[in-house]
Amino acid sequence: YRTMVPRSGIEARPRYARAEGGVRYTGPVLLLTSDVTVSGGELATLGLRALPNVVQIGGTTRGSFSTVLAKPLPNGWVVELSNEVISGPDGEVFEEAGIAPEVPLEMFPLDDPVGGYFRALNKAIELMDADTAKQEDL
């Protein structure tokens, strides 16, 4: 992902996570997200989606990325202002809009949030089982 401070004159800076040596899992990964995937979870989603074996499923993330700049006020209060723009590797900004999944699933329907969560988990298991069966046929 990339970070930048708007109107600062400083260019956007790419952020990378470098792979370490040793054993790595390279099999399929389903990343389950929803509207309660926020902030650091969204940064993790951006990073994981860059991997070829990861598929995001579930709901669109919250769209609340930026870290805050906290400033104390004379009366003792603290004001916190969003001060960064975080984008995907291609420059797309997901602030407010969130990151839409590749495979949409309703995670927490208003009429049955717990049941919806378990239905989404079961669907994820079905997708993993289908992908495993497909790979075994190769």
Where do the protein language model's features map onto the residues?
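Gly/Ser/Thr-rich loop/hinge elements
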Residues: 1-28, 66-72, 83-87, 93-94
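Second-shell loop/turn segments in exported
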Residues: 18, 30-36, 106-114
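Short, well-structured beta-strand/strand-turn elements
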Residues: 38, 51-65
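Extracytoplasmic/secreted cell-surface and envelope-processing proteins
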Residues: 38-44, 65-68, 90
